[in-house]
Amino acid sequence: MASPQLCRALVSAQWVAEALRAPRAGQPLQLLDASWYLPKLGRDARREFEERHIPGAAFFDIDQCSDRTSPYDHMLPGAEHFAEYAGRLGVGAATHVVIYDASDQGLYSAPRVWWMFRAFGHHAVSLLDGGLRHWLRQNLPLSSGKSQPAPAEFRAQLDPAFIKTYEDIKENLESRRFQVVDSRATGRFRGTEPEPRDGIEPGHIPGTVNIPFTDFLSQEGLEKSPEEIRHLFQEKKVDLSKPLVATCGSGVTACHVALGAYLCGKPDVPIYDGSWVEWYMRARPEDVISEGRGKTH
């Protein structure tokens, strides 16, 4: 059983810096840069990683470690694929994984990989609070170049409780067995601002609640306190004592909702992996709620 320290969802930049300076026997640490950006931003996450990263970090490619047979972006891979990929990045059964990204927000895509490790049964995983942005602000050391972690043996077993499918969400329109929170920007949720992907109109799934993922972060890019997050959920009438599912555009920022709930003592929030892209492509026009064009065919 992992120590409570290893199960903490967030670790500070100073904690990571100290752990790198003085590694603990029997508790190997592996940092992963899980930076990912929407194509329209024109940022090359891997190239940026090679230019600068936290010492000892390896690059985790969300698109590469995915189900490449799916028509939808970066859907969860099979257990064997994930195990092989994580092992190549130096993650073994006893490894404490600390994930960050280099986004301007502080954390953007890293919570997706935090959720992936947990979904595949590895709970010794944390996020670097504030990401690379906060690390830089603390003037902590950096490295450059490609990383070459020593491969490790990693075993993965998917817990299906971490995922919801299109069919689950569709059935929930009638049954209302669980609440659904959408973490996209308000304009995209309402249908008044464009989606970043061609061929996908903005809008939302009927009955969903909108909490943009940036609402979970402070101006400095650090995660808000559990008290502030609890208030955020309460403001939107989300009951953390009842089942809750998170969605977004393609299953990345939804993981901020799962993280926020986890910090409030609710570790069981699954992600609708296909999220809005899948819903828009598969749902009936009347199940696409929008103040804009909606779905016309």
UniProtKB/Swiss-Prot annotation:
Region (Hinge): 145-160
N-acetylalanine modification, residue list: A2
Domain Rhodanese positions: 25-144, 174-288
Keyword rRNA-binding (UniProt): no
Residues that coordinate or bind substrate: R188
Residues recorded with modification N6-acetyllysine: K40
GO MF annotation list: 3-mercaptopyruvate sulfurtransferase activity; identical protein binding; thiosulfate-cyanide sulfurtransferase activity
Record's function text: Transfer of a sulfur ion to cyanide or to other thiol compounds. Also has weak rhodanese activity. Detoxifies cyanide and is required for thiosulfate biosynthesis. Acts as an antioxidant. In combination with cysteine aminotransferase (CAT), contributes to the catabolism of cysteine and is an important producer of hydrogen sulfide in the brain, retina and vascular endothelial cells. Hydrogen sulfide H(2)S is an important synaptic modulator, signaling molecule, smooth muscle contractor and neuroprotectant. Its production by the 3MST/CAT pathway is regulated by calcium ions.
Disease listed for this protein: Aberrant MPST activity is found in a few cases of mercaptolactate-cysteine disulfiduria (MCDU) characterized by the appearance of large quantaties of the sulfur-containing amino acid, beta-mercaptolactate-cysteine disulfide, in the urine. Some cases have associated intellectual disability.
Misc: Thioredoxin (Trx) or dihydrolipoic acid (DHLA) are required to release hydrogen sulfide from the persulfide intermediate.
Stated name of the protein: 3-mercaptopyruvate sulfurtransferase
